Amino acid sequence: MRGSQVPRILVVEDELMIVLMLESLLLEAGFEVADVATKVEAALAFVEAGAFDVAILDANLAGVSSAPVAAALTARSIPFLVVSGYATAQQNGAFAAGLNVQKPFQTETLIEALRSILSASATE
């Protein structure tokens, strides 16, 4: 993370209602939403730009796996949460480096997971 600045989050999610809910709860928790991507290609462009500290990644974007995004995040050592309705299935392959948060999730669970991976990445 960049100094003492507010942590910036990339949200990769294709459902508008979930995006709006995430933006609201992240702001309330003291985070900044850096960007929102609804498709794999857009998410990969944001990862390439790297203007965020952590990502929240939906495992499935309108029927398309976001595994390429997870792989790109891992290659750049950017921490991420995998938010998915699929229990442990997404913990394999490219998603293995992320912390899994199952949908539907409690707000506290998501915020605690974000703080945990940000804290872990700050000590590396």
Enumerate the language-model features and the residues they cover.
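Hydrophobic/aromatic residues positioned on beta-strands within the core alpha/beta folds
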Residues: 83-84
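Conserved acidic carboxylate
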Residues: 13
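Acidic catalytic/metal-coordinating carboxylates
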Residues: 39, 65-68
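Active-site residues of response regulator receiver
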Residues: 58
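Two-component/phosphorelay signaling modules centered on CheY-like receiver
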Residues: 16-35
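Non-catalytic signal-transmission and effector/linker regions of two-component phosphorelay proteins
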Residues: 1-8, 41, 92, 99, ...
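Acidic, metal-coordinating helix/loop segments flanking the phosphotransfer/catalytic sites
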Residues: 36-54
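The feature encodes the CheY-like receiver
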Residues: 62
